[in-house]
Amino acid sequence: MPMTVEIKSLSGIDASPYFDDLARLRITVFRAFPYLYDGSVEYERKYLATYADTKGAVFVLALDGRQVVGMSTGMPMAAETDEVKSPFLAAGYDPLQLFYFGESVLLPDYRGHGIGVRFFEEREAHAKYLGFDWCTFCAVERPADHPRRRIKRARTMRDA
């Protein structure tokens, strides 16, 4: 599939025209393993609004024509929820010194083409522009034997 994806970095409020598309994208991607999350457009719009209302927040969008196929977010850690900040505080980190990379979500057909790398590059550039020296993110970890984990079968002679 030829890729003609545009990467667009927007300040928080500038992403608001995309909120419905971003909400649906988050619901679609987060429904799958490892997230296993079932959200609603209403909740997602409220969640996205927290980024739009936060000074220093960034949305990095991946657009295939007019279709939003991916997004990534970031904000100063000091603006994050206590739930997100608490592990960093417990480890001795000052939230004022950290830029937090929120989610990166990308439709499956667009994975493996360097878009995720661009998400990191754009957020790092934004954090550096704001004067941050440190960036961080959180990840979902599931057990290796989780029943929803896809099993990758090794290629064997039977496949030849």
Regions found by a protein language model. Name each.
Residues 49-61, 77-82:
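A short helix-loop-beta-strand connector motif used in the catalytic cores of GNAT acetyltransferases and
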